[in-house]
Amino acid sequence: MKQLKTQDRDRRDVICQSENQVATYSDILCEKLDEIVYAEHLSPKKGMPDYGTDWEEFVDIKKADMKSLTYDQLLLFLKNIDPKKNGGRLDLLKTFLRGRDIPFKDGLWDWRN
């Protein structure tokens, strides 16, 4: 697991990074000044349909709404999910947050490279 420092983020952890013949995938948790962002990235490989388009499905959580939940606890929760058994991490994260009455924003971005 990598942890990187950048100007607009306090912390960034790559939870999972993989690829197959179709695409590359990465699941990332970032801590910014006032929010925590979980994102799942998908980038199709050359020769595949939609090559050149990347997707990011995300969940944004305001730090002020986190109650007693910490970044490290959220990271541990996400790392302990087996995405193959559970159909991914995103829906389980949303259920986890709703169960604790922690509001969040979610969505899907796509862009052309």
Per-segment meaning from a language model:
Residues 9-40:
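Amphipathic, interaction-prone secondary-structure segments
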